From Swiss-Prot:
It comes from the Bacteria. GO terms for molecular function: translation elongation factor activity. This is Elongation factor P. Pfam families: EFP, EFP_N, Elong-fact-P_C. Involved in peptide bond synthesis. Alleviates ribosome stalling that occurs when 3 or more consecutive Pro residues or the sequence PPG is present in a protein, possibly by augmenting the peptidyl transferase activity of the ribosome. Modification of Lys-34 is required for alleviation. It comes from Hahella chejuensis (strain KCTC 2396). Pathway: Protein biosynthesis; polypeptide chain elongation. May be beta-lysylated on the epsilon-amino group of Lys-34 by the combined action of EpmA and EpmB, and then hydroxylated on the C5 position of the same residue by EpmC (if this protein is present). Lysylation is critical for the stimulatory effect of EF-P on peptide-bond formation. The lysylation moiety may extend toward the peptidyltransferase center and stabilize the terminal 3-CCA end of the tRNA. Hydroxylation of the C5 position on Lys-34 may allow additional potential stabilizing hydrogen-bond interactions with the P-tRNA.
Length: 190
């Protein structure tokens, strides 16, 4: 894999640190008044999910991680693994364990496309799209006189996630949810 110099560091770059693939979250170039310039890097270990910080002298180089982000369609779960299939027509399937899927489980819907990060052919992480459309399976009927301003109520979705929705939303309706914040965005027109 390619080597990256400190002047090529940017957020999102995948590098190898201590034998583990890591993703750079923040990169700050520091040039003190006296001494050599350096880069202060905040990174996330893609295997463990831990966040760390390290400094690199200006001009150092680091090996790039052999990590691939692929769009894959979620097929099903067998209780232990979550199965995904490549969307390029090859029908190649990968099984991701619970640690790779993480919090994405509450947004997993069959036949939807997710970004799966592979390292040496094994799934490291699964990222949902920014917005998903899910059906409400359970929510209380909203009574208009309950609040002085626009209120909200909890609603359980088909995936098991609970989202705060406005009072006018009813059971059985499809809604659009922001997966980054877990908030209701809008009603989906059918």
């Amino acid at each position: 894999m390619a080597n990256y110099s400190t002047n090529e560091f940017k957020s999102g770059l995948k590098i190898m640190l201590d034998g583990d693939p890591c993703s750079i979250i923040e990169n700050e170039f520091v040039k003190p008044g006296k001494g050599q310039a350096f880069n202060r890097v905040k990174f996330r270990n893609l295997k463990s999910g831990r966040v760390g910080e390290r400094t690199f002298k200006s001009g150092d180089s680091v090996e790039g991680a052999d990590v691939v982000d692929l769009d894959m369609e979620y097929l099903y779960t067998d209780g232990e693994f979550y199965h995904f299939m490549l969307t390029d027509g090859s029908f190649e399937q990968h099984a991701a364990d619970v640690s790779a899927v993480g919090d994405t489980t509450k947004w997993l819907k069959e036949q939807d496309v997710y970004t799966v990060t592979l390292y040496n052919g094994a799934p490291l992480s699964v990222s949902p799209p920014n917005f998903v459309e899910l059906e409400i399976v359970e929510t209380d009927p909203g009574v208009r006189g309950d609040t002085a301003q626009g209120g909200s109520k909890p609603a359980k979705l088909t995936t098991g996630a609970v989202v705060a929705v406005p009072l006018f939303i009813n059971q059985g309706e499809m809604i659009k949810v922001d997966t980054r914040s877990g908030e209701y965005v809008s009603r989906v027109k059918s």
